């Protein structure tokens, strides 16, 4: 098939971007052809048409982002091919080039992003360790971190909002098995080339030397990342802030399973910790709050700094209310700054930046009334930028640049003249027409326009004798003649170029403004980070007041004391919540928690973890009193689940999770276990639960709460001084079970499973038969005798072995 020049142009460009969907600008549409068209048609539910027998599907250019969002969400890489010259002045085929490659990790536009989450592009390389570098180009944030083992790296990535991963080819298969629903792409050789690596990174940060960045062994992976960004953005990749160096001792370790089991983020709306705490006023604050939840601090000094500022807001209601009122006017200037940095800022962005800068002096002023915020004195409110935007941008500008409706009148004389010409032309024509009528004495003289002859003066034949000498005949009609004058011809010539010049001049001015702002991007980002922190701190104070939270304190002797503690999420979902106490220390650090179904065991152990996380992120906590140790890691293994897609059974998944905990926990960790050993036979389950408990107590000596229906495990309290038995109270009245949800010392005498089955609505005959069967098998004395003769001394002699986490599934 012989191709037209345009289709040949398409094929030539497509050959360079075989791994991407190519959206090819044709007039007012972006078109996809061949296999790309079939993907676009199916994904976007668009009609598939044909051009020269080639499948074709297109989207309107003005609605590109709407369709682009869906393609990116489905994990496609999209190459945007634009017309890079004006079709009206092009000689022959319009020149076209790919101007940008859009992937899940290289999105800048607001309507393609989640306002409450970061959007990290991550690169991974392996030498002696796994080196990881991440960049969120929408906010300008970046980080580097290293891991000794694969599983620790996977766990970290599960706690970061990663949307795309770049990796060395030999890592791809393992990553695809462990990172579901994330786009994974192999790095090319040129991404990893050592040549000019330091120079490329220096260009990103606009510095001459990169030693101060402290990239160390992460130099290569960070270089690969910025080279990929430069390739996809089709422009220099620039980052204002140096990457954050993440070290092991900075944050509490929370693996993906723990994040899921504790419902920290995600899941059903209103039923996770983030949704309960998120009363932020800004998108920047919302993202920061989520990061604080997922990365609680381990540095006690930094924790207390946050808590003291929250307390200052709690104790100063006037300050709190004023700050939250002002923050309502603050927009997402963090992402706006980065769009300015990459030349992608819209008129809407500049208006949002202006409204934020207008309120910043008031935020600074009110913060300085409280001694808890001395850093506010150093905040640059960027008055010069605000002044530029006030002078240049209309109060309610058009979103379209080039119509003369963005730049204020009086800002640029040339633009004002062009605007006057374009938008007041009718006034000129009316005045001209009346003036000519008066001058010629022709009452029905009319000025008109058509696309063939342009502007003209029309005079009926009955008045032709009155035509002045300067009138030049242009067209003859049946009953009239049309004329032109030098003045009208000059006006016409101006009008032909005025709209074009208006569009060009307003765009020039807009680009000049954005260029002047680009030198201030670093300062805008600093201001954005400050405002985001104030938003989160004031929000935590607002939540503390609203929900009755208390400022926690921290012990250095391992003491954990909670008085009337509550589950922050569950208490928002029920009419009445029963608070509970808890006391642990280094001598009593392991609790076996028994109790019936529906009694609240799982809620209790979750709330202990949530209170600890809230405290270490710098939040007040739902309790009357809270004294806590600083935990280095928090693990939660709650319930059991299948993973049919990977072929893993309930029990295997459970054992994998427990093995990971055993190998990664330290004496400063908090472990919460719920129903370990339930996925296999009773004897096997009890034996495993028993052995795990002994190992955690004897070898790790961390704080652990183990909720179980295996009452046999309560025998451990007789064998080990550090283990304590607790239960959740239940009473029976008139053949009804009443759950008190109160945790007390003791052991549950039964599970009340049959009673719960009755509450669930099982037929009466099934309930009755269950009682009969229970009477037959209730005698457990033989099993208990067998367990008591287990030689605990053998287990105590076990030494904690250094086993690679990848071997966990063999445990």
Curated annotation (Swiss-Prot):
Question: Any one Gene Ontology biological process term?
Answer: mismatch repair
Please provide, alphabetically and separated by semicolons, the GO molecular function terms listed in this UniProt record: ATP binding; ATP-dependent DNA damage sensor activity; damaged DNA binding; mismatched DNA binding
Which InterPro entries did the record assign? DNA_mismatch_repair_MutS, DNA_mismatch_repair_MutS-lik_N, DNA_mismatch_repair_MutS/MSH, DNA_mismatch_repair_MutS_C, DNA_mismatch_repair_MutS_clamp, DNA_mismatch_repair_MutS_core, DNA_mismatch_repair_MutS_N, DNA_mismatch_repair_MutS_sf
Recorded GO CC terms? cytosol
By which gene is this protein encoded? mutS
Binding of ATP occurs at: 595-602
Its annotated function is as follows: This protein is involved in the repair of mismatches in DNA. It is possible that it carries out the mismatch recognition step. This protein has a weak ATPase activity.
**Is the keyword Membrane in the record?**
no
Q: Which keywords accompany this UniProt record?
A: ATP-binding, DNA damage, DNA repair, DNA-binding, Nucleotide-binding
Q: Which SUPFAM superfamilies match?
A: DNA repair protein MutS, domain I, DNA repair protein MutS, domain II, DNA repair protein MutS, domain III, P-loop containing nucleoside triphosphate hydrolases
State the family named in the UniProt similarity comment for this chain: Belongs to the DNA mismatch repair MutS family.
- What protein is this chain from? DNA mismatch repair protein MutS
Q: Which organism is it from?
A: Pseudothermotoga lettingae (strain ATCC BAA-301 / DSM 14385 / NBRC 107922 / TMO)
A single Pfam family it belongs to is MutS_IV
- Keyword Cell membrane assigned to the entry: answer is no
| Gene3D superfamilies reported in the protein's UniProt record | 1.10.1420.10, DNA repair protein MutS, domain I, MutS, connector domain, P-loop containing nucleotide triphosphate hydrolases
């Amino acid at each position: 098939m012989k191709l037209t020049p345009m289709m040949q142009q398409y094929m030539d460009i497509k050959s360079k971007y075989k791994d991407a969907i190519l959206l090819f600008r044709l007039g007012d549409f972006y078109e996809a052809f061949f296999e790309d068209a079939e993907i676009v048609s199916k994904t976007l539910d668009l009609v598939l048409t044909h051009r020269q027998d080639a499948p074709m599907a297109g989207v309107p250019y003005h609605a590109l982002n709407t369709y682009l969002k869906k393609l990116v969400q489905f994990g496609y890489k999209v190459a945007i091919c634009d017309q890079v010259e004006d079709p009206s002045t092009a000689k022959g085929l319009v020149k076209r080039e790919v101007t940008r490659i859009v992937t899940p990790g290289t999105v800048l536009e607001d309507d393609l992003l989640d306002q409450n989450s970061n959007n990290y592009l991550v690169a991974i390389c392996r030498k002696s360790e796994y080196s990881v570098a991440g960049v969120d180009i929408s906010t300008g944030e970046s980080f580097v971190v290293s891991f000794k083992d694969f599983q620790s790296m996977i766990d970290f990535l599960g706690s970061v909002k990663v949307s795309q991963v770049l990796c060395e080819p030999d890592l791809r298969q393992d990553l695809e098995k462990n990172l579901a629903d994330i786009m994974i792409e192999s790095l090319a050789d040129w991404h990893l080339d050592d040549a000019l690596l330091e120079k490329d990174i220096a260009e990103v940060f606009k510095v001459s030397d990169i030693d101060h960045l402290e990239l160390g062994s992460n130099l290569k992976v960070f270089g690969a990342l910025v080279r990929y960004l430069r390739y996809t953005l089709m422009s220099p990749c620039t980052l204002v802030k140096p990457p954050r160096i993440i070290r092991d001792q900075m944050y509490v370790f929370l693996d993906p399973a723990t994040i899921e089991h504790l419902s920290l983020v995600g899941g059903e709306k209103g039923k996770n910790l983030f949704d309960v705490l998120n009363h932020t006023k800004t998108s920047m604050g919302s993202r920061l709050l989520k990061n604080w939840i997922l990365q609680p601090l381990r540095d006690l000094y930094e924790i207390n700094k946050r808590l003291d500022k929250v307390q200052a807001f709690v104790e100063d209601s006037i300050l709190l209310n004023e700050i939250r009122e002002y923050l309502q006017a603050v927009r997402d200037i963090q992402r706006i700054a980065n769009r300015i940095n990459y030349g992608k800022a819209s008129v809407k962005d500049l208006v949002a930046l202006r409204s934020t800068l207008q309120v910043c002096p008031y935020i600074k002023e009110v913060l300085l009334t409280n001694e808890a915020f001395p850093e506010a004195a150093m905040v640059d409110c960027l008055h010069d930028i605000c002044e530029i935007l006030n002078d240049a941008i209309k109060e309610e500008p058009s979103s379209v640049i080039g119509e003369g409706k963005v730049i204020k009148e009086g800002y640029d004389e040339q633009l004002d003249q062009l605007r006057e010409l374009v938008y007041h032309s009718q006034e000129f024509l009316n005045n001209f027409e009346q003036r000519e009528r008066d001058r010629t004495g022709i009452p029905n003289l009319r000025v008109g326009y058509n696309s063939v002859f342009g502007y003209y003066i029309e005079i009926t034949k009955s008045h032709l004798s009155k035509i002045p000498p300067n009138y030049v005949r242009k067209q003859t009609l049946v009953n009239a003649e049309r004329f032109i004058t030098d003045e009208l011809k000059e006006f016409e010539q101006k009008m032909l170029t005025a709209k074009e010049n208006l569009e060009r001049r307003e765009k020039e001015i807009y680009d000049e403004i954005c260029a002047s702002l680009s030198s201030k991007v670093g300062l805008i980002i600093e201001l954005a980070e400050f405002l985001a922190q104030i938003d989160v701190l004031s929000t935590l104070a607002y939540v503390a007041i609203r929900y009755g939270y208390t400022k926690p304190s921290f012990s250095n002797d391992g003491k954990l004391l909670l008085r009337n503690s509550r589950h922050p999420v569950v208490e928002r979902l029920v009419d009445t919540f029963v608070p509970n106490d808890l006391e642990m220390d280094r001598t009593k650090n392991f609790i076996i928690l028994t109790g019936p179904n529906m009694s609240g065991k799982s809620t209790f152990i979750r709330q202990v973890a949530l209170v600890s996380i809230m405290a270490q992120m710098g939040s007040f906590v739902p309790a009357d009193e809270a004294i806590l140790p600083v935990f280095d890691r928090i693990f939660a293994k709650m319930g059991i689940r299948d993973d049919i897609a990977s072929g893993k059974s309930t029990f295997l998944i459970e054992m994998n999770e427990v093995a990971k905990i055993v190998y990664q926990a330290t004496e400063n960790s908090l472990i919460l276990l719920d129903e370990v050993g339930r996925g296999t036979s009773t004897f096997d389950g009890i034996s495993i639960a028993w052995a795990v408990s002994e190992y955690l107590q004897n070898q790790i000596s961390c704080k652990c709460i183990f909720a179980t229906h295996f009452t046999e495990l309560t025998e451990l309290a007789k064998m080990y001084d550090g283990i304590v038995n607790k239960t959740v109270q239940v009473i029976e009245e008139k053949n009804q079970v009443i759950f008190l949800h109160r945790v007390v010392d003791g052991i549950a005498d039964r599970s009340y499973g049959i009673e719960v089955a009755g509450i669930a609505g099982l037929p009466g005959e099934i309930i009755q038969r269950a009682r009969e069967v229970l009477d037959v098998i209730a005698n457990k004395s033989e099993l208990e005798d067998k367990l008591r003769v287990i030689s605990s001394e053998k287990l105590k002699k076990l030494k904690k072995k250094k086993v690679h986490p990848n071997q966990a599934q063999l445990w």
